[in-house]
């Protein structure tokens, strides 16, 4: 995970997280990165739910999952062909 590009959303609100995640994914696609990490923290899960909703609705995302060793982080895999 340390080598993956990451977006840290600590301290962000749900509405700003949505915009930041969309911009981050666009950047990763432009850079031809196929895997990245979104750090949302554990807390009450509000930001995590927003992140997962954005990822679920983005057709360019192959899969996403909570990191096994760090539940405050979601690993995102981007489709090869977009």
Positions of PLM-derived features:
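Long, charged, low-complexity intrinsically disordered regions
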Residues: 1-82
């Amino acid at each position: 995970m340390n080598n993956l590009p990451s977006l840290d959303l600590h301290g962000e609100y749900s509405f700003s997280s949505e915009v930041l995640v969309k911009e981050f994914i666009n950047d990763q696609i432009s850079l031809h990165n196929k895997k990245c990490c979104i750090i949302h923290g554990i807390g009450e899960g509000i930001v995590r739910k927003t992140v997962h909703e954005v990822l679920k609705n983005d057709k360019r995302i192959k899969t996403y999952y909570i990191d096994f060793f760090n539940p405050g982080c979601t690993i995102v895999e981007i489709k090869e062909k977009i």
